[in-house]
């Protein structure tokens, strides 16, 4: 996980529980608000979408761009965060 943000490392370091969507790497207040408006208020709801898309990086990034207008970097950071979390806990 070299080159990852502190936010990414913090998220991947422990079970997800009831963390807010804004605790995901790449998701700040603006994107978090857009995701919440779309019904994705908790990190586990975004994880659910990631799993529904069968962990496919391009599909997930496209979904992020469509739902909350994430940039490529934001979508990539979120994907990598969820992917690393799944490797650790699933």
Curated annotation (Swiss-Prot):
UniProt keyword terms in alphabetical order: Chromosome, Cytoplasm, DNA-binding, Nucleus
Matches recorded under InterPro entries: BAF, BAF_prot, BAF_sf
Entry GO terms, CC: condensed chromosome; cytoplasm; nuclear envelope; nucleoplasm; nucleus
Localisation: Nucleus; Cytoplasm; Chromosome
Organism superkingdom: Eukaryota
Function: Plays fundamental roles in nuclear assembly, chromatin organization, gene expression and gonad development. May potently compress chromatin structure and be involved in membrane recruitment and chromatin decondensation during nuclear assembly. Functions are required in both M phase and interphase of the cell cycle.
Similarity comment text for this entry: Belongs to the BAF family.
Protein name: Barrier-to-autointegration factor
Organism whose genome encodes this protein: Drosophila melanogaster
Organismal lineage: Eukaryota, Metazoa, Ecdysozoa, Arthropoda, Hexapoda
Name of encoding gene: baf
